[in-house]
C-alpha cells in the first residue's frame, strides 16, 4: 500500500534530559560476526530450531519428601501395521507420573501410563493436570481440557484409586465431554467438588453419588466461577473453597444480569456468521453483583456473608478460609479500588467483623490471599502502607502488625513459609530492579532481608519451593542466557542435581553473531530515573548511524527492562540487530517495576499521558548521549498496552517517531473493561479529561509517520471495536496507514496455522521497508 507522507509537523520544546552511567549489568559481545549463518523469521518461528529444553510439570508433595513429574512412558503400542512402507512403528501409550527423592534423585514410577488407560481403550489419558488426595491414596486427573477465555479451565476429570487400581470418570454416566470445572478433593479425600453449568456439585467417591449444592444458576447467575472481567483483572478462575474440616464450601456467586453483553462475530468457521455473547462491563457501566455464600455440604443450605453496603459498586477479589472451619476471610473493595476492607465472616450466621483496612490515595494495584500460620492466630500479608511493597504478620483481630521486611525496595513474591524454623522466603532485588533474587526474613521480625541466591547467579532467579521450605527447583536465566534449572537444598543454596542445562540451545546460540547489550538509566525531565536496555549489532561501529526500534509496553501489567531470557522474543531482536537495527526498551512510570508505590501510582488519572512523555524523554536522552542513533529513523512497536503506547508515541510525538507497529491496542480507554481501566484511570465521572487525553484516538489526526495497525477480530479482551473506531478517525483526517486484521484470532494473535510466522514476517518486512 502506498502511504502518503505528511508534511505537517508539530513543534516540541526540547527538554534537557541526561543519561546516567551504565549499570554493572552491561554486557559487551566478545567477538564480532564472522561467517555466522544469519537468523531468519523462519528459523525462529517455523523450524523450532531454537526451542528450549522442556523439563515438564513438576509438583512437590505436600510433606516436602520429594516431587513428582510427568514423563513419557517406556511402554509402547504397535501402530501403522497397514502403512504403505510395511513397517511397524512403536509409540508410547502415554505418560507416567514419577517420583524423585530430592536427596538421591532416585526415580520411582508412582502411576504408570497403563493404569491410566480407560476400559476399552488402548491409549492412556492425556494428563493436563493432576491432584493427589492428602493421603496419596487417590489421584484426580484433569484431561481433554478446553479453553475458556485465557486458560483451559473446562474438561474431564477421572479418579484413580491406588488401593483398588480402579479408574473412573467423574460427573455421572451422562456427563458431557469437557463439561466439568475446578474439581478438587475434600480434605479427607472422600469427595470431589466441581462446577458444571454454573452450579456446584459434590461427588462421593465410594459410590459416585452426586449431590447438587447450588441450584439457582441461569439467567445471569453463576456459582463457583467468574465472569470475564473478574477472571481477567483479578486473576481468579476457581470460585470455591473447601473448609479445612470438609463440612462446608465457601463460594462466589456473581449476578451478571446488570452487565451489558458484548457480542463478537465469527465470519470464518461456518457458512453463516456466528455470534459469541458474554457480559463485559466497560468503563462506567454496571458491574456484576458479587456475593459470598457458605454452603453446608450435608444439607446444601447456603448462608450468605452480610457484607456492609454490598452492591454492584463493590468488588470481592479474594476470599478464603481463615485458618479454621468457622470463619471465612473476605476482601471487600470499592469500585474506585482505593479501599480494601478485610472481614472475618461467621459461617453459622454470616455476621462479619472488620479486622483490617488497606487504603490508598489513588488505587490498590494488587490483591493477595492472606496466608494463615498454622496456629490460626496470625496471617501473612503484603502491603504498600510504607510506600514500598513489604510483608507483614498480622494478628487475627488486626490489632498487631509486624513488618517482616524493611527498606527502600519492593518484594515481588512470597515463595514459602517455613514455620518449623521460623522463616519466610520471598523474591526481591533491592539493588537492581531488572533482576530477581531469593531472600528470607524471620517470622518473629528479628531478622530481615537475608539474601539466599549466591552472587554468581546474576540475573533473574525463580524458585519452586517445597511446602516446608527445605528444597526448591531453582531456575536461573539472564538477558542473553537461556534458563537452566537445578534442584537445591535451600539452606546454603546447595546445588544437588542439575535438571536442565539447555546445552543444545546454548550451542546453537554460540553459532550466531552475538549482539552487544547493556542495561542503562536515563533521567526524565522531572528527575525521575527510567530503566532500559539496548542491543547493538555484533559488528557495531560507533562512527555509523543506525535506525533504532523500541519495544514498548508501558502499562501497569508488564515490565520490559528485565535481566532474563525472553526466548524467541530475544532471538527476533537479535535478528533485527543482524539486519542493521539497534533495539531498545524503556520502562516508563506506571509499569510494575519494583521501584515503590510512587513510581507505579504516579500515572493515576492520566494513563497514556505521563507514560508517553517518559518514553519521549528517554529517546531524546539516548540520542544526545549516543550519536550513532539516527534520530530520523526511530521505530516503535508494542502489543496490547504496548499497542496503545505505540499509537500515543506516533500521535503525540510525531516529530520523534517515524514508524510504528501497533498490535491489539486500546485506542479509546472508555471502551476497555471497568476493573482495569478505572483502577488506573479513575472513575470516568472524576477523570473525564484524563480519559480523553490519554486515549490515542483523541490524537489520531497528528499521525505523520508510517503506521501498521494489527488486530484479531475475535479479541475478547481488547475489542476489535476500538480499532474500527480508530480507523474511522484516521479516515476522517485522511491519515494514511497500513492495516492487517487476523480473522477470529484472540488477543494474543496466535491461533491458526501459520499465524505467528505470518505476523512476525510482516512486522520484520515493515521495519525493513520503512525504517532503513
Residue ranges and their predicted role:
Residues 260-261, 317-318, 325, 461-772:
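Serine-hydrolase catalytic core recognition
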Residues 8-12, 16-459, 468-471, 481, ...:
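Beta-propeller folds
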Residues 1-5:
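N-terminal secretory signal peptides that target proteins for export/translocation
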Amino acid at each position: 500500500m502506498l502511504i502518503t507522507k505528511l508534511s505537517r509537523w508539530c513543534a516540541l520544546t526540547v527538554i534537557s534530559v541526561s543519561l546516567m552511567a551504565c549499570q554493572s549489568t552491561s554486557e559487551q559481545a566478545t567477538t564480532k560476526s564472522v561467517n555466522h549463518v544469519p537468523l531468519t523469521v523462519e528459523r525462529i518461528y517455523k523450524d523450532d530450531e531454537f526451542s528450549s529444553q522442556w523439563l515438564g510439570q513438576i509438583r512437590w508433595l505436600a510433606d516436602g519428601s520429594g516431587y513428582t513429574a510427568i514423563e513419557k512412558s517406556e511402554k509402547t503400542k504397535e501402530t501403522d501395521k497397514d502403512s504403505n512402507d510395511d513397517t511397524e512403528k512403536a509409540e508410547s501409550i502415554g505418560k507416567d507420573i514419577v517420583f524423585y527423592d530430592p536427596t538421591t534423585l532416585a526415580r520411582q514410577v508412582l502411576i504408570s501410563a497403563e493404569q491410566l488407560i480407560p476400559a476399552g481403550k488402548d491409549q492412556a489419558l492425556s494428563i493436563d493436570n493432576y491432584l493427589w488426595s492428602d493421603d496419596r491414596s487417590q489421584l484426580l486427573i484433569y484431561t481433554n481440557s478446553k479453553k475458556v477465555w485465557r486458560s483451559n479451565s473446562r474438561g474431564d476429570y477421572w479418579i484413580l484409586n491406588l488401593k483398588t487400581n480402579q479408574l473412573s470418570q467423574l460427573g455421572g454416566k451422562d456427563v458431557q465431554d469437557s463439561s466439568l470445572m475446578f474439581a478438587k478433593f475434600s480434605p479427607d479425600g472422600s469427595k470431589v467438588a466441581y462446577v458444571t453449568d454454573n452450579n456446584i456439585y459434590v461427588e462421593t467417591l465410594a459410590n459416585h453419588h452426586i449431590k447438587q449444592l447450588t441450584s439457582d444458576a441461569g439467567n445471569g447467575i453463576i456459582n463457583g466461577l467468574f465472569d470475564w472481567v473478574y477472571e481477567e483483572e483479578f486473576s481468579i478462575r476457581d470460585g470455591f473453597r473447601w473448609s479445612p474440616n470438609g463440612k462446608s464450601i465457601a463460594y462466589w456467586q456473581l449476578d451478571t444480569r446488570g452487565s451489558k453483553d458484548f457480542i463478537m462475530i465469527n465470519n470464518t468457521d461456518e457458512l453463516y456468521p456466528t455470534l459469541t455473547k458474554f457480559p463485559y462491563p466497560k468503563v462506567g457501566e454496571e458491574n456484576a453483583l458479587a456475593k459470598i455464600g457458605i454452603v453446608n455440604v450435608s444439607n446444601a443450605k447456603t448462608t450468605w456473608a452480610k457484607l456492609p453496603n454490598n452492591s454492584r459498586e463493590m468488588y470481592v477479589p479474594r476470599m478464603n478460609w481463615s485458618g479454621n472451619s468457622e470463619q471465612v476471610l473476605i476482601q471487600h473493595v470499592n469500585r474506585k479500588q482505593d479501599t480494601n476492607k478485610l472481614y472475618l465472616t461467621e459461617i453459622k450466621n454470616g455476621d462479619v467483623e472488620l479486622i483490617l483496612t488497606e487504603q490508598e490515595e489513588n488505587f490498590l494495584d494488587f490483591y493477595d490471599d492472606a496466608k494463615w500460620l498454622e496456629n490460626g492466630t496470625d496471617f501473612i500479608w503484603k502491603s504498600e502502607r510504607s510506600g514500598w511493597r513489604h510483608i507483614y504478620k498480622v494478628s487475627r483481630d488486626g490489632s498487631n502488625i509486624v513488618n517482616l521486611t524493611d527498606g527502600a525496595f519492593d518484594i515481588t513474591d512470597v515463595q514459602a513459609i517455613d514455620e518449623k524454623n521460623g522463616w519466610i522466603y520471598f523474591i526481591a532485588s533491592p539493588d537492581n530492579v531488572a533482576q530477581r533474587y531469593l531472600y528470607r526474613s524471620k517470622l518473629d521480625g528479628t531478622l530481615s532481608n537475608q539474601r539466599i541466591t549466591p552472587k554468581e547467579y546474576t540475573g533473574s532467579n525463580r524458585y519452586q519451593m517445597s511446602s516446608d521450605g527445605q528444597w526448591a527447583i531453582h531456575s536461573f536465566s539472564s538477558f542473553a542466557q537461556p534458563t537452566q534449572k537445578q534442584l537445591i537444598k535451600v539452606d546454603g543454596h546447595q546445588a544437588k542435581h542439575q535438571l536442565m542445562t539447555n546445552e543444545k540451545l546454548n550451542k546453537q546460540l554460540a553459532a550466531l553473531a552475538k549482539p552487544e547489550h547493556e542495561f542503562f538509566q536515563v533521567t526524565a525531565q522531572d528527575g525521575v530515573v527510567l530503566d532500559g536496555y539496548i542491543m547493538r549489532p555484533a559488528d557495531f561501529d560507533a562512527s555509523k548511524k543506525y535506525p533504532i526500534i523500541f519495544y514498548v509496553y508501558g502499562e501497569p501489567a508488564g515490565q520490559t527492562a528485565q535481566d532474563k531470557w525472553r526466548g524467541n522474543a530475544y532471538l527476533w531482536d537479535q535478528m533485527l540487530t543482524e539486519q542493521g537495527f539497534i533495539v531498545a526498551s524503556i520502562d516508563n512510570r506506571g509499569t510494575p517495576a519494583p521501584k515503590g508505590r510512587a513510581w507505579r501510582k504516579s500515572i493515576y488519572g492520566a494513563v497514556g499521558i505521563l507514560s508517553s512523555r517518559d518514553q519521549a524523554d528517554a529517546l531524546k536522552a539516548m540520542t544526545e548521549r549516543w550519536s550513532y542513533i539516527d534520530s530520523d529513523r526511530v521505530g516503535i512497536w508494542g502489543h496490547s498496552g504496548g499497542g496503545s503506547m505505540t499509537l500515543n508515541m506516533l500521535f503525540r510525538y510525531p516529530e520523534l517517531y517515524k514508524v510504528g507497529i501497533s498490535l491489539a491496542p486500546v485506542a479509546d480507554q472508555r471502551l476497555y473493561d471497568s476493573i482495569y481501566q478505572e483502577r488506573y484511570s479513575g472513575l470516568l465521572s472524576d477523570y473525564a479529561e484524563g480519559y480523553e487525553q490519554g486515549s490515542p484516538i483523541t490524537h489520531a489526526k497528528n499521525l505523520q509517520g508510517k503506521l501498521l495497525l494489527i488486530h484479531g477480530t475475535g479479541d475478547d479482551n481488547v475489542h476489535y471495536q476500538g480499532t474500527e473506531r480508530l480507523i474511522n478517525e484516521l479516515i476522517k483526517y485522511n491519515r494514511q496507514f497500513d492495516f492487517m486484521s487476523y480473522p477470529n484470532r484472540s488477543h494474543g494473535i496466535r491461533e491458526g496455522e501459520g499465524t505467528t510466522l505470518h505476523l512476525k514476517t510482516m512486522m520484520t518486512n515493515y521495519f525493513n521497508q520503512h525504517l532503513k
